[in-house]
Amino acid sequence: MACSKHLVLFLTILLSLAETPDSAPAHRGRGGWTLNSAGYLLGPVLHLSSKANQGRKTDSALEILDLWKAIDGLPYSRSPRMTKRSMGETFVKPRTGDLRIVDKNVPDEEATLNL
């Protein structure tokens, strides 16, 4: 009997501490700074007012919104040359000005991995 009283008391306290919709902070949409899919930092989301007589301000705001949407959809660009380099080519400084010509004294990858 004493165990059930403690259980009821414990559940009452838990329910009183539970977050209710009134005590939860209201979600106000996507505000503030955010990252797009490529990792670029974007400014706050543009909210257009409902006034129809703003003229050029509405047009420029729509242009900015279109630019943000276009930038968000761009793929992340990577240099194809950077992905094709080997470990040796990445960390070895060439003696000539041409990055494609590597010094002959540099060991190949298999020799360095087997050390």
Swiss-Prot record:
Residues 86-115 form a propeptide. It is found in: Secreted. GO terms for biological process: behavioral response to starvation; neuropeptide signaling pathway; regulation of appetite; response to hormone; response to insulin. GO terms for molecular function: hormone activity. InterPro entries: Galanin (IPR008174), GALP (IPR039244). Belongs to the galanin family. Hypothalamic neuropeptide which binds to the G-protein-coupled galanin receptors (GALR1, GALR2 and GALR3). Involved in a large number of putative physiological functions in CNS homeostatic processes, including the regulation of gonadotropin-releasing hormone secretion. This is Galanin-like peptide. It comes from Rattus norvegicus.
